[in-house]
Amino acid sequence: MNIGKDNILRTYNPYKKIVYKGAIYHIIQRAPGKDILFVEENDYLYFLHLLKEIQKEFSFSVYCFCLMPNHLHILMKINELNLSLGMKSLFTKYAIYFNTKYKRKGHVFYGNYRAFLCSDDRYLIAASVYIHLNPYKANLVNDPMDYKWSSISAYYSLPTRTFLDYKYVLNILSNNIKKASLSYMDIVRQGKPLDFKSVIEDSRFLGKFSLVFLDKIRDFFSGQDKNTYDYDIQRYFEQVKNKKRLKDPEDIKARKYLIEQLKSRGYTIKDIASMLSLSRQSIYDALEA
């Protein structure tokens, strides 16, 4: 077995807002406490109007979105170094609209937005599916395809006139857009029964969700010329999980590599210890092996 060496790949970073041209982000914003962002249909429509304006003004490429009653998701690429300016403009304009319309004062949003950097095609697929599954997992609809305020309809209806660049995501699956659409819908359906938790509650959850999700959709990427680090991680996880004491040198190398990869994705030693059913000291010892 060839354990990867010095191949630490950061595919998903929920902490610092690393900004560079061409970077792809999963943006999350929410209302404070139990407040809501959208009271009625016109609120959703106005936010989408603003998103279209901002997308054009700041040259963003918007891949998908989901507007939930108390929070929202946007998956997008920046083509200039203007992420903060664009998001500030979007959320400030909506906050002014919301407070004016409902004759209220105070914060509409709970602090600053979160920007999760996605730098791998497979994680981009996982993020988009996570976003589109939100309404289903929140019991707002019986089928994610039925939710009105997400971009999922574009992924199966394939509109020719839209501000969404949904084809970018679908082309990861196939250059044949109709075939890619069918594959994407199948992937969404496969994601429905998976354990699901809000990234708002646990900023590392999407990374954990992706590890399971990527293994589930392995067949969709067969034959594609993509990096295999994520599949390596899943394989090594299966190899060493629930093993307290390792004697086989290959198992020892696999555990060390797995821990290094998980650390590079933002997991803490405590998180990794929990995932591998080990003590924190065992994790430190494994890194020194």
Question: Which residues does each PLM region occupy?
Answer:
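Short beta-strand->loop micro-motif that forms the acidic, two-metal-ion catalytic signature
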Residues: 70-79
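Conserved strand-loop elements at the edges of beta-sheets that form or border functional pockets
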Residues: 67
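Short Pro-Cys-Gly-centered "Cys-loop" motif that presents a nucleophilic cysteine in a tight turn
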Residues: 1-64, 78-289
